[in-house]
A protein has these predicted regions:
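The beta1-alpha1 cofactor-binding region of Rossmann-like NAD(H)/NADP(H)-dependent oxidoreductases
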Residues: 38-39, 59-71, 105, 216-217
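Short C-terminal tail/terminal secondary-structure segment
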Residues: 92, 97, 148, 205, ...
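A conserved structural motif in NAD(P)-dependent oxidoreductases
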Residues: 207-218, 229
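Alpha-helical segment proximal to the catalytic Tyr-Lys
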Residues: 128, 169-173, 231
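Substrate-binding pocket helix/loop in short-chain dehydrogenase/reductase
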Residues: 96-100, 104-109, 152, 203
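Active-site helix of classical SDR
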Residues: 123, 156-159, 164
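Canonical Rossmann dinucleotide-binding motif of NAD(H)/NADP(H)-dependent dehydrogenases/reductases
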Residues: 2-32
Length: 248
């Protein structure tokens, strides 16, 4: 599906990002496994290569413009260009449900700089390279938290949805499409680390399909949105949530 294509996946050292990176490689893409966790990214890239795919790893802080530019320069230097970007990097400390009125501002700013601003920083770093190749596609990671509650994790994802729609307007003339996936609760190590068991149980009760999702449940939507099959789709947010939104 993606032979001769080049994809950057941020936050790809584990969980959902790892699943995206591995799936893209299986479909023939050359993958840049990018993460602030350099050792984790290296391990994922090594596994992709061992499985017969093509990948490199690049350390990146998505909130830092110089770091994002270095990531993109490395990708272009090795593979010659960029076709796809998956803005998946995130930090999850906000799942402790602090109120906006009480969360420490320094933590709030750091949280938003990664979960919201990082989408814009990485998109700005990559779009000119996509335009040089005649277009491209971007997938942002949102969340059903944008619709369901208003702590600052959800607020960051509301912002991601807004960025997705505004950037679709700005990038369309360059034949660059940008969409977002809004997962419901996904069973990953990060989720298990920050989410109390009782809260997980309560979340599952809001899902008509009666289970948490897995990273693999999201892969098909990501591949579709990057592919030519989605060539007339941009600026959209797709809930992949086991029906959580319709019950909540």
């Amino acid at each position: 599906m993606f032979d001769s294509k080049v994809a950057i996946v941020t936050g790809a050292a584990q969980g959902i990002g790892q699943a995206y990176a591995q799936a893209l490689a299986r479909e023939g893409a050359s993958v840049v496994v990018a993460d602030i966790n350099a050792d984790g990214a290296a391990a994922v890239a090594k596994q992709i290569v061992a499985d017969g795919g093509t990948a490199i790893h690049v350390p990146v802080d998505v909130s830092d413009e110089d770091s994002a530019k270095a990531m993109v320069d490395r990708a272009v230097g090795v593979f010659g260009g960029i076709d796809y970007l998956v803005n998946n990097a995130a930090i999850y400390g906000g799942m402790k449900l602090d109120l906006l009125l009480t969360v420490p501002l320094d933590y709030y700013k750091k949280f938003m700089s990664v979960n919201h601003d990082g989408v814009l920083v990485c998109t700005r770093a990559v779009y000119k390279h996509m335009a040089k190749r005649g277009g491209g596609a971007i997938v942002n990671q949102s969340s059903t938290a944008a619709w369901l509650y208003s702590n600052f994790y959800g607020l960051a994802k509301v912002g991601v949805n807004g960025l997705t729609q505004q950037l679709a307007r700005e990038l369309g003339g360059m034949k660059i499409r940008i969409n977002a996936i809004a997962p419901g609760p996904i069973d990953t190590e990060a989720t298990r680390t920050v989410t109390p068991a009782e809260l997980v149980k309560n979340m599952v009760q809001t899902i008509p399909l009666s289970r948490m999702g897995t990273p693999e449940d999201l892969v098909g939507m990501c591949l579709f949105l990057l592919s030519d099959s989605a060539s007339w789709i941009t600026g959209q947010i797709f809930n992949v949530d086991g029906g959580q939104i319709i019950r909540s």
